[in-house]
Amino acid sequence: MLTYPGSDLETFRPFWRRDRIDLGGRKGFVRLAIREGAPIVPAVSAGTHEQLVVLARGDGLARLLRTEKWLRTRVMPIVLCVPWGLTIGLLPYLPLPAQTTIAFGEPIRWPQLRPADADDPAVLTRCYDEVVGVMQRMLDRLSAGRRPWLGQP
């Protein structure tokens, strides 16, 4: 099972948190991997958050507008983008030119776990934290020395 950050919470995290993995505590992918005995292949990218500058995720605005109910998103981002400038919401935009680098990690396996362990919150949290930790270390390596919009030195 390939795990790549990309939920609403991850996609629209603020620019200054672009080098942080934020899966929003969502553990469904871990539950599925444990239940099916499937490995998780972590994937991360550096540079995609330079194509659209998110100033704020807009969690409070999304709650106020109840976007989770009608848009299935918990965010209403405040962004700086071309051609609109400063915007609120999910308008189409022209991505800024940015070098994007993607890395795939080694599969993460838990052969000692049984399908029934997928319903144990402590097991889910431990496995989730392991995946997030691996992904964060991968992103740290990709981001080291990176200059926004210019890519690697």
Predicted regions and their residues:
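Non-catalytic C-terminal accessory region of glycerolipid acyltransferases
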Residues: 1-153
